[in-house]
């Protein structure tokens, strides 16, 4: 049995796939782990590249197919297909640094630990714009909770690990219901927080979420995301996602209360006019407004879907995965 399954979920990212797998292979070989790639309904050259990678790397690389479009469904497929007790998720844009997997696995010596995540450092195709500063960089998956390993809780000052660099004890994640398809990305609907949702359920069940600062990945940021328009859209969808998460896990009235106590003091109602050079302070305020607007829209959306969200609250089964063909690639 492998010590861990490094899971890379991908959808139509053939150009990035070889680099993503090569980056994971170095860590896998050092720790007797497998690399498991989940092809999430790709329509490009991804299946052919995966077959070649499986042939090239023997039993170290496996591939499975998830026909249901959506990152949450792909992550659940990774949970179901993993042949080890720990799954470590990487984005197909992420490359782990040496020692990443060892740092992620170390906290699992404590049986109370169900999730461990690490630091995410942004890397750019070109020169990043001068306006890209905290807190805006978090929208691009930058994540840093300091230099000290510690337990994370759902409380002010703590942020659960991000999905580009997160791991779970498989049995605990499955028992908690896996990743919710109500809050994760789906095609052009780039909602977030499916990993936050799973962490929250583990947390309230008394399981431990840990931060491992030595588990570092570099995350590539493509040029198309380095614009104020993309940043504004991302914050709007972050607000929608936040409202869905609150309604699903904490109830409608608490979700409504957060609009008042969290968003209202942070929002200044001024018009944002994009112009060059970009004024960083104005963009940060505009993103806060868009997030608040998205949260309000998410409350409406979540209220209309209240019964569905309530039904999804308890743990739900993870669908079985297809059998592997002799070449190591699973197909529907």
Map each language-model feature to its residues.
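A short, conserved alpha-helix in the catalytic core of glycosyltransferases
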Residues: 163-168, 172-176, 182-215
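Conserved donor NDP-sugar-binding/catalytic core segment of glycosyltransferases
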Residues: 99-132
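Non-catalytic, C-terminal membrane-associated alpha-helical segments of glycosyltransferases
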Residues: 233-240, 247-332
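Glycine-rich, basic loop-to-helix element that forms the pyrophosphate-binding segment
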Residues: 66-82
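Short, acidic, metal-binding catalytic loop of nucleotide-sugar glycosyltransferases
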Residues: 22-32
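Short aromatic/hydrophobic "clamp" motif used to bind/position activated sugar donors
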Residues: 87
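A conserved acidic beta->alpha catalytic loop
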Residues: 23, 39-48, 94
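Short, flexible, basic/aromatic active-site loop/helix in glycosyltransferases
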Residues: 118, 136-159
């Amino acid at each position: 049995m492998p010590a861990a399954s490094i899971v890379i979920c991908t959808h139509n990212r053939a150009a990035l796939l070889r680099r993503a797998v090569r980056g994971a292979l170095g860590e896998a070989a050092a720790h007797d782990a497998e690399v498991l790639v989940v092809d999430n309904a790709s329509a490009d050259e991804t299946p052919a590249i995966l077959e070649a990678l499986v042939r090239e790397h023997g039993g170290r690389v496996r591939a499975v197919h998830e026909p249901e479009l959506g990152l949450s469904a792909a992550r659940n497929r990774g949970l179901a297909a993993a042949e080890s007790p720990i799954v470590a998720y990487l984005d197909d844009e992420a490359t782990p640094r040496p020692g990443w997997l060892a740092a992620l696995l170390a906290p699992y010596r404590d049986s109370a630990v169900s999730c461990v995540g690490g630091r995410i450092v942004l890397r750019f195709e070109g020169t990043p714009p001068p306006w890209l500063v905290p807190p805006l960089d978090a929208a691009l998956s930058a994540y840093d909770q300091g230099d000290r390993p510690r337990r994370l809780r759902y409380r002010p000052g703590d942020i659960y690990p991000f999905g580009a660099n997160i791991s779970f004890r498989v049995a605990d994640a499955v028992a908690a219901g896996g990743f919710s398809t109500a809050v994760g990305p789906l095609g052009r609907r780039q909602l977030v927080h499916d990993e936050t949702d799973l962490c929250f359920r583990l947390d309230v069940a008394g399981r431990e979420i840990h931060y491992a600062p030595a588990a570092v990945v570099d995350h590539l940021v493509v040029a198309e995301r380095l614009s104020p328009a993309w940043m504004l859209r991302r914050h709007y969808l972050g607000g929608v996602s936040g409202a869905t998460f609150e309604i699903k896990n904490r109830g409608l009235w608490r979700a409504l209360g957060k609009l008042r106590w969290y968003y209202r003091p942070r929002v200044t109602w001024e018009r944002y006019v994009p112009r060059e050079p970009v004024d960083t302070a104005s963009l940060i305020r505009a993103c806060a407004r868009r997030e608040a607007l998205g949260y309000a829209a998410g409350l409406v959306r979540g209220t209309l879907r209240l019964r569905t969200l309530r039904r999804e609250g308890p743990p739900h089964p993870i669908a079985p995965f297809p059998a592997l063909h002799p070449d190591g690639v699973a197909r529907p």
